[in-house]
């Protein structure tokens, strides 16, 4: 699998802290602004970037991310442009892992082999495709692994001991634990339940386990990061973009900086998480 992802988690383990994994929607609200956001994320403390692929029917996403996708699509964002976004980012940053996250339909239309080849060229390290279960691994997961691209699988509170081995079988990079049932942007989960779930997953895999859904503040990141290898934040970032826009959805001079300020705060949470847990 890609060395960039493995190296990043090894570095974080040596530092004794969890990763801050930040999600944003490619092309929201426009290409240039989203590239500015992407470049600002590592500088603000993001360790891994999740690059959202806008899609017209995002069934697992809450209202904030749905609206972000609509803004991106309205602005002309396509899967090809989202790959180009990663390629442009790689011109100045070859260290930060990039995971593309979204749905299978745009990839299928683009063409699986062409997509994987273009993703490799663009410097993509992993994929999260939320509507492809393990039973459909031959569609994209196995071809991605053969190309050397991590395929990151989701585990949920309803993933029981019988189901978990199938979920983990072809997973690489890290495991994304969805901390509650429902859509993105839900309330903060019970930290004790999250800790127990992470430990249960770790009994079956040596992969890092990152926790997402419901993390919005530095304190949330600190609490969840105390028991996980990574904390995923998406809705809070997408909301920060939205609140910085004009009434007609255009970027302002403050858009990129508003996101960077939020991420710096979240980073302070993850950077203190393991230190607190170790006391």
From Swiss-Prot:
GO molecular function term, any single one: tryptophan synthase activity
Source organism per UniProt: Rhizobium etli (strain CIAT 652)
Subunit description: Tetramer of two alpha and two beta chains.
Signal peptide: none
Enzyme Commission identifier(s): 4.2.1.20
Family annotation (Gene3D superfamilies): Aldolase class I
Residues at the catalytic site: 50 (proton acceptor), 61 (proton acceptor)
GO cellular component, one term: cytosol
Keyword Lyase: yes
Family of this protein: Belongs to the TrpA family.
Identification of the protein by name: Tryptophan synthase alpha chain
